Amino acid sequence: MNSDELPGNPESRPREIRSYVLRAGRLTRAQERALAELWPRFGIPAATGDSGVLDLDALFGRSAPRILEIGIGNGAALLSMAARNPDRDYLGAEVHAPGIGHCLLEIERLGLTNVRLFMEDAVGVLHDRLPDHSLAGLHLFFPDPWHKKRHHKRRLVQPPFVELMARKLTNDGYFHVATDWPPYAEHIAGVLATSGHFGAGIDPAHSSGSSSGRPLTRFEARGQRLGHPIWERIYPRLRD
């Protein structure tokens, strides 16, 4: 299976500025099988024409709170949360095929039915695929911080993204974000504070009424090995 045959190939939807880098990666035979056999069940095909907005109740076969995770990597956090919360439905967006393949294999192994995957740009997913006020939560764990100043425009959390995110969240929804890069943490906190859509961020490590509920991710473990402080907040969506 080559990159042109992959479902939801992100190259088919150009963007002026991407917040991610398309890394080359080889699919294992197991991942190739997962994309061929499991994607039709758990994957969401890329939109065509004007028919892209999804009926999420039809997609999952029920009505339930929905959580979107952007940049799921190999799906560790997404699947851990989905397994612990069978009363919720989980959507994951990832542009790298090996990560999607691994996640599909784990969905099969764990017997999960409350997970669906996009293999396309998450901004496009939010803008084109999801109805307004359809998400109970949005998760963004350890996004690329784009360290160099000339690349800061590529950071995902910018005012237009926050406006889009607020439109897709329910009035009692939340944004759960974590990073190991302090300058990006300051940037995220500043953008959210001035947006008018979110309340003060809650540190799940210091709140008895809130729990992170996510496992240690590969990028977080790397940050810890390098001595980076972990910054994590849950921002409640303010009612309109």
Q: Where in this protein do the model-derived segments appear?
A:
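A short SAM/SAH-binding and catalytic strip from SAM-dependent methyltransferases
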Residues: 135-155
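A short acidic, Gly/Pro-enriched loop at the edge of an enzyme's catalytic core
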Residues: 127-137
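S-adenosyl-L-methionine
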Residues: 1-68, 76-83
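A short glycine-rich, Lys/Arg-flanked "PGG" loop and its adjoining helix->strand segment in the class I
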Residues: 157-171
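Conserved beta-strand signature within the Rossmann-like core of class I S-adenosyl-L-methionine
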Residues: 171-179
